[in-house]
Amino acid sequence: MRQGLLVALLLGTCAAVSAQEATARRPEPNTRVPKGVQRYAPTGFPDRIVASPAQDAATGFSVAWRTDTKVDAPLLEIVVAGDSPDMGEPRRVTAISTLLKTENGSAHHHRADVDGLQPDTLYAWRVQGDRTWSAWHHTRTAAATTSPLTMLYFGDTQNKNVSLTTRVVREAMRHAPDAKLALYAGDLVSGGDGEDDNEWGEWFEANEVLPTSLVVAPAPGNHEYFEEFEDTPQERRVLGAHWPVTFALPGNGVAQAKKTTYWFDYQDLRVVVIDGTSALDLGTAKAQAAWLDQALGSNPHRWSIVMTHQPFFSPREGRDNVALRKHLLPVIRKHNVDLVLQGHDHVYGRLKSPPPVFVVSVTGAKQYRLSDEARRTMRPVAEDTQLFQVLHFEGPRLRYEARTATGRLYDAFDLVDEGGKGKQLVERTEGRIDERACTRAETLKGRADRCWE
């Protein structure tokens, strides 16, 4: 009897342990695509549609999209948007098509450049597939330099895009329904895991209507590159095949990093995108600095932003991007850049300094820990926090807000152009929540150097 009772107790204990193990939290994969399942195969229907600004965003923009290989040199149709379904005879632009082979099969990625548009005009446009078309999308061209502008800035998305980036993008669009431009500070996907195309599919799914409602300008991150000949004397960084075909970016970058650097004008703002990975790992920092000097030196506008993936002043322990500070930082200071927007370190930190204002942010699921140096030199800082940023330009005032995934205000300041006195930073503390710190000892994978992954 006792023996039977003991066996029953042991079986019950084992069953309870098994139940706990079955419901225990486990690390989530980067994509929701189960092994052996093909979720993002290209078809004759256009997908991964994204608009990006032309060099002059008042008179043009470009569109990239994807289909299967049956579609070659398809059309983009564009017309001034109207209230009737009959918007008139559209203009037709023929796209250039590029083949890309991935784990999801072969696809054609298309690019159409639209020029000759009228400023501050709402256009309707659609792209062609195999005997079919996309929906009609709306894009408004940039207005006069004196017009207000609202834009969004996202740090790294990178991991678990559909699972956890989606909610941040939705919250951002709720808080900035009038935004016309979105900047992404690199590492849009993780890559290098045999699921690169699945990850890009999830990035577009997570961003939903944003890439066809706003114009999108991304910076390349180190995860947009891969290591070729790894662990050999020939090891080197190589730009991934998706980057040049996924976005239709301005082709005005420095020759040594032509596909990953560019600039454009949007109303009273010039945005210059540099490639930190190329600067640090491929020796192009000096060339990029000379090009940046020209791009900023010819800026006729009141405002300027430089965006790069790797920070000039890193808030994460153990990272120090010396080549950026040596070659590119003097150019940024010389031209009195207003904002330097960065990612890479998966925390939030704003350097305590007058303009230029250096900001590092993160949108995605991967969360690192702050260094002691960052806690001394940056304010505010944050760990374990998904964020988006809203920037509003109106005349002599730039208003910046960093908000959490639930929309709570985390950081806010104004830059005010006082004419001869230059740009002055005005802190806005009302309504901000308290600084956030990671309270977990380690991640689900047992890593103490990260807060979440």
Regions from the PLM with identified roles:
Residues 4-14:
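Bacterial N-terminal signal peptides
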Residues 111-113, 122-138, 198-300, 319, ...:
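Extended active-site neighborhood of metal-dependent phosphoesterases/phosphodiesterases
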Residues 149-219, 224-225:
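Conserved, compact domain cores that house catalytic/ligand-binding motifs in diverse enzymes
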Residues 82-109, 152-167, 190-192, 234-237, ...:
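Acidic/histidine-rich helix-loop elements
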Residues 19-153, 174-177, 384, 390-453:
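Acidic, histidine-bearing metal-coordination/catalytic regions of metal-dependent phosphoesterases
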Residues 185, 189, 299-316:
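Short acidic, glycine-rich surface-loop motifs adjacent to enzyme active sites
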Residues 148-158, 268-278, 305-309, 356-363, ...:
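Active-site-proximal beta-strand elements of phosphoester/diester hydrolases
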Residues 129, 154-159, 186-188, 222-223, ...:
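Active-site metal-binding loops of divalent metal-dependent hydrolases
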